[in-house]
Amino acid sequence: DGLKLLAEMREKYGLLIATEMRDATHADKVVKYADIVQVGAKAMYDHGLLTAAGQSGKPVILKRGFGSTLQELVNCADFIMSCGNDQVILCERGIRSFENNTRFTLDLCGVAWLKQHCNRPIILDPSHAMGYAYGIGDLARACTAMGIDGLLIETHPCPQCAQSDAPQQLNHQQFGEMYTSLKPIAQAIGKTLI
């Protein structure tokens, strides 16, 4: 039902749909509805899922596991590519550290390493790294200044009503303000914000 709802939103608003594939047995259904397949951080090492993503014919967002090294992320991306899909987008969404006031630590040093050593698009997910709405704009601005290729930002018309990850959701006004603040940063480094 969720996939059909996403497909309706794509038709109504002309959006591309990215959704997470949690199990290889769901591959046919996800590929039928999604424009972009996402492999979540917890599933980064699931070879069956990576194989299904590699055979999907769709762009794949591969999220880095919170305990995974950069090389392990690259190796998993290479595995997807070995299955016939070179449309792999790497996603940094935070790693586990000794800090416990944020959900994860967004590894900006790792992003710089990936930019230097990998020829793949790199996006960041500050929503999951921070875990709270109040820091997402700052992280998004830092990521944009690094020249990354995209951001995953969680929004909800009523964040406190969200059924999952409510504390990290931006309301539409917060998202609009953040988006506006990213434009001059993107322009300053020769990027276009869409």
Regions found by a protein language model. Give the residues of each.
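Alpha-helix N-cap and loop-to-helix initiation/capping positions
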Residues: 1, 41, 45, 68, ...
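N-terminal active-site wall of soluble small-molecule enzyme domains
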Residues: 1-34, 46-49
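Generic structural signal for well-ordered alpha-helices
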Residues: 3-7, 27, 50, 73-77, ...
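Structural motif
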Residues: 18-21, 40, 63, 127
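Short hydrophobic/aromatic-enriched beta-strand-loop microsegments
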Residues: 35-43, 60-61, 87-88
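Glycine-rich phosphate-binding active-site loops on the catalytic face of alpha/beta enzymes
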Residues: 41-45, 145-168
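Catalytic alpha/beta core domains of metabolic enzymes, predominantly
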Residues: 51-157
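C-terminal helical cap(s) of enzyme catalytic domains, especially alpha/beta-barrels
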Residues: 158-191
